[in-house]
Amino acid sequence: MRIVIQRVSHASVTINQQEKSSIGTGYLILLGIGKEDTEEDIDWLVKKIIGLRIFDDEMGVMNRSIVDIKGEILVVSQFTLMASYKKGNRPSWIHAAPHELSIPLYNRFCDALSEAMGKPVGTGEFGADMKVELLNDGPVTICMDTKNKE
């Protein structure tokens, strides 16, 4: 699994000109699911996301987590994060999981985050053409890959 976490002042996702979800201060998470991904990847990511300290404390130091600030999370599926660009200039999606694998993992990821946060997370709609708006805060952007845990 690959994610991009963006610290935001607010974010929203719109589908067919209708707002599906919106959040205030928190994280916009773009989620790409690969063919080899499992529930173990979800568990690792959720622990990292919940514990990640990228919000400022009283001294202006990034020392507070999403839980500490009582922030919100919006998760948007994005298979393009699994792009392979090894050959040529047109990306390939051979590493992206098929729908029958990725939809249950996407739903489980969102449920696990909600459970860890103790409140619902906002979501997009898997496979839909979505318009995502956000106001980056910082900007602070973190990329994580469960196959390359650095």
List PLM regions with ranges.
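A charged helix-plus-loop insertion that forms the helical arch/lid used to bind
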Residues: K87-L101
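N-terminal, polar/charged subdomain of small-to-medium soluble alpha/beta proteins
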Residues: M1-N89, P104-E150
